[in-house]
Design a protein with these regions (language model features):
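Short, charged, surface-exposed secondary-structure boundary motifs
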Residues: 26-32, 84-85, 205-210
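Short, active-site-adjacent cap segments at secondary-structure transitions
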Residues: 5-7, 59-60, 258-260
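C-terminal helical cap/extension that packs against the catalytic core
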Residues: 52, 56-75, 94, 140, ...
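Flexible active-site lid/hinge loop adjacent to a nucleotide/diphosphate
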Residues: 1-55
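Nucleotide phosphate-binding/pyrophosphate-handling subdomain across enzymes
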Residues: 5-18, 22-23, 36, 83-195
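Active-site-proximal loop/hinge segments that shape catalytic or ion-binding/gating pockets
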Residues: 255
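Short, surface-exposed connector motifs at secondary-structure boundaries
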Residues: 43-51, 161, 165-170, 192-195, ...
């Protein structure tokens, strides 16, 4: 969903509103600046309803302003350094954990909910997030990153994985939706790639692999990278497995619709 003012769920008056963080997403509908998107996301803030946010910088200032106008108590996300969270891959999950704990505290302050530390720990321990930095086998990682901010996180995590597991090469299986910033996304991952296989999901908004390859060739004029086009995610993954050595890592990414076909 879009999230924010234009999201269908915004008809509901919640116990607490949460704006996790702000990135350049759905720019055709929400605007092409962080400030404009922050304004749209802040559209979920209701009169007298507490709001939690992990936003920073200018985005946070806009959310603060709107929260004040609507008399909505604002909770900027606190860091809970003593609450370790290692049930999901990725350092960014620590921030997600902090958002959850801040939200629970906001709920407890304004509503008579009964929830104790033991229940919170149990809930966090059972958390699952399929398709986000998920290893579906020893050398196949799937990640549903589909915008520049998501790929920034993925890129950071892959560097950590490379050092920890002594990865030789990354083989990417990539499919991206037409409405995404394809050039920026591909440009971000070029330094990591040894081989890239372009494919597409069955979603009607999926970019043609040929178009992705065309854009890729336009921006990559320095690094020798093997490229391939396959007409389905499963065929692309099968080919990647065929060419991968034991110290290589296959990364399937670019679209939630793509990832669903391989997990």
């Amino acid at each position: 969903g879009l999230g924010g003012r234009l999201d269908a769920t915004n008809v509901v008056v919640p116990l607490v509103s949460v704006v996790t963080n702000i990135g350049l997403e759905h720019t055709d509908l929400l605007g092409n600046t962080i400030e404009r998107i922050a304004f749209e996301k802040a559209g979920i803030i209701k009169n007298n309803v507490p709001v939690v946010t992990g936003a920073k910088g200018n985005a946070l200032q806009i959310i603060k302003k709107i929260a004040k106008e609507r008399n909505a108590p604002l909770f900027a996300v606190e860091r809970y350094a003593d609450a370790k969270f290692d049930y999901l891959n990725g350092d960014f999950q620590q921030q997600n954990k902090d958002i959850v704990l801040t939200t629970i505290n906001a709920l407890k302050k304004f509503h008579p909910i009964k929830i104790n530390q033991k229940q919170i720990k149990k809930g966090i321990k059972k958390t699952q997030w399929q398709g986000r930095l998920q290893f579906i086998s020893k050398n196949v990682l799937v990640d549903c990153a589909h915008n520049p901010s998501g790929f920034e996180v993925l890129k950071k995590e892959l560097k950590i994985i490379k050092n920890r597991r002594k990865i030789n090469n990354f083989i990417f299986v990539v499919g991206i939706q037409k409405d995404k910033n394809i050039m920026e996304i591909l440009n971000m991952i070029i330094p990591l790639i040894s081989t890239i296989i372009f494919t597409k999901s069955k979603n009607e908004n999926a970019s043609a692999p040929q178009e992705l390859l065309k854009i890729f060739n336009k921006i990559n004029n320095e690094k020798p990278i093997e490229t391939k086009i396959m007409d389905s995610p499963k065929k692309a993954l099968s080919y990647a497995r065929k060419i991968a050595d034991k110290n290589d890592l296959i990364v399937v990414t670019g679209s939630i619709y793509l990832v669903e076909y391989v997990i």
